[in-house]
Structures are given as structure tokens and as C-alpha cells.
Curated annotation (Swiss-Prot):
Pathway given in the UniProt record: Cofactor biosynthesis; phylloquinone biosynthesis; Quinol/quinone metabolism; 1,4-dihydroxy-2-naphthoate biosynthesis; 1,4-dihydroxy-2-naphthoate from chorismate: step 7/7
Protein name: 1,4-dihydroxy-2-naphthoyl-CoA hydrolase
InterPro entries: 4-hydroxybenzoyl-CoA_TE, DHNA_CoA_hydrolase, HotDog_dom_sf, YbgC/YbaW
Domain of life: Bacteria
Residue stretches in coiled coil: none
Similarity comment text for this entry: Belongs to the 4-hydroxybenzoyl-CoA thioesterase family. DHNA-CoA hydrolase subfamily.
Listed EC numbers: 3.1.2.28
Disulfide bonding pattern of the chain: none
Keyword Disulfide bond: no
Length: 146
């Protein structure tokens, strides 16, 4: 099944996003990725307040990485694309590509997420409507207990 197409997330880099060197502080690029994730969930029709309220189901990020390619500065326009992929029945990975206004890639990031049921933090299947958005992982992926 093809993933549901969503619009790219866009934002302007603010002064508060930068560090003393005048470039975006490294951790803020991961924040921008999470903003793009939240925007994608909203586009899918997910009630964000309920999704992030820990009301029985939690979807923590279990792994994050980012590679910086070019700096971003205050006032730059940023575009974030997301490539979603199912890893197994309860885990998925999002690959983010961040672009500046000129279309240059400035960073590539990945986050892995796991769906857990409270209070015992048992793994559960990825909830609707996310499965339709996620691409299937290659056959090597399995339901492992990472």
C-alpha cells in the first residue's frame, strides 16, 4: 500500500533557535523534526491532545540520530519532508530531510518510535490511522524486542 501523501512542513528559523555562533542550535533541528511529525499526525486526522496525553497508549521515541550538512541561520525558511516506514507491528521509523529555501539539503534525521500500552508498557500494534501512512519495511525487519 502506498503511504498517504502529506504536505511538507515549513517554518522560519527564529533568533531563539540559534546559538552564540548564529547558527541553529543542534538540538533544535530535532525539535523541528518533531514539529513536522506533529504536523503530519494532524494532517492524518489524529487528535494531538489525546495522542500525546498518555491516556493508555504512548509512542515514545526510542532512537534518534541526525546528520548536519549545512548551517541554518535566523530568518532562513526551512522545509521538512518525512519518509515513514513500518519496522514491525509496534515500531516505526521516520526519516526527515531538511531543506533550506534554496532547496539544499541541510540535515537528515531519523527517529524510531514504539507503541506501548500503559500501565505495564506492553508493546501493542501501531494504532490507526498510522498504518496506512507507513511503508512496509524490508523483509529483514522483524518483531524484535529492542
Amino acid at each position: 500500500m502506498n503511504p498517504t501523501p502529506l504536505r511538507d512542513y515549513q517554518r522560519t528559523v527564529h533568533f531563539a533557535d540559534t546559538d552564540a555562533a548564529g547558527v541553529v542550535y543542534f538540538a533544535n533541528l530535532l525539535r523541528f523534526c518533531h514539529e513536522a511529525y506533529e504536523d503530519a499526525l494532524a494532517q492524518l486526522g489524529v487528535d494531538l491532545r489525546q495522542f500525546f496525553s498518555n491516556s493508555g497508549l504512548i509512542v515514545p521515541i526510542t532512537e534518534a540520530q541526525i546528520r548536519f550538512l549545512k548551517p541554518l541561520y535566523c530568518g532562513d525558511r526551512l522545509r521538512v519532508t518525512i519518509d515513514p516506514q513500518r519496522l514491525d507491528t509496534s515500531r516505526f521509523q521516520l526519516t526527515y530531510t531538511l531543506y533550506n529555501e534554496g532547496g539544499d539539503r541541510v540535515a537528515i534525521a531519523q527517529t524510531q518510535h514504539m507503541c506501548l500500552q500503559l500501565p505495564h508498557r506492553q508493546r501493542v500494534p501501531i494504532p490507526d490511522p498510522l498504518p496506512a501512512w507507513l511503508k512496509s519495511a524490508p523483509e529483514e525487519a522483524s518483531d524484535r524486542e529492542d
